[in-house]
Design a protein with these regions (language model features):
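Beta-propeller domain segments
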Residues: 1-97, 105, 127, 134-135
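Blade-level signature of beta-propeller repeat domains, shared across WD40, Kelch, NHL, RCC1
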Residues: 109-136
Length: 136
């Protein structure tokens, strides 16, 4: 994942950390001079479904965090999670936290609602729309 800036070269598909469905690499190069490095990489892929920045006040400690819907955890298909990524003021990753792993659901969508809460859409047969609220 990158934060895009005008005039920068992000390299797709000349460079990539990605793997095709058949197991081959998308590119033989993960990096080349003159091409911007990604800010965040998932190895192995979590099969990113959606990304949302949290800007509301309902979860003060989460303000400015990135929330990523993942459709897999590690190499196990059908075991997604919601990933919270804490960023510094320069958009650099400080740490990650896996949330909702106990659901064993692929996370299809995550969005901040107008009420400042997070809404998560899961997949699978028992798919649901979840509202994430503060504990207190």
């Amino acid at each position: 994942m990158n934060i895009l800036s005008a005039g920068k070269n992000y390299g797709w598909p000349l460079v990539s950390y990605g793997i095709n469905y058949n197991g081959t690499r998308v590119s033989e190069h993960a990096w080349r001079e003159g091409i911007e490095e990604p800010k965040i990489v998932w190895i192995p892929s979590i099969a990113v479904a959606n990304i949302s920045f949290y800007t509301a006040d309902r979860f003060p400690k989460w303000k400015g965090n990135l929330f990523v819907g993942g459709m897999r955890t590690g190499e196990v298909a059908g075991t997604g999670h919601l990933e919270r990524i804490v960023l510094n003021d320069r958009g650099e990753e400080l740490r990650r936290e896996s949330l909702l792993t106990m659901l064993h659901q692929r996370i299809r969508d995550v969005r901040q609602g107008p009420d400042g809460l997070l809404y998560v859409l899961t997949e699978e047969q028992a798919g649901a729309l979840l509202r994430i609220e503060p504990a207190n």
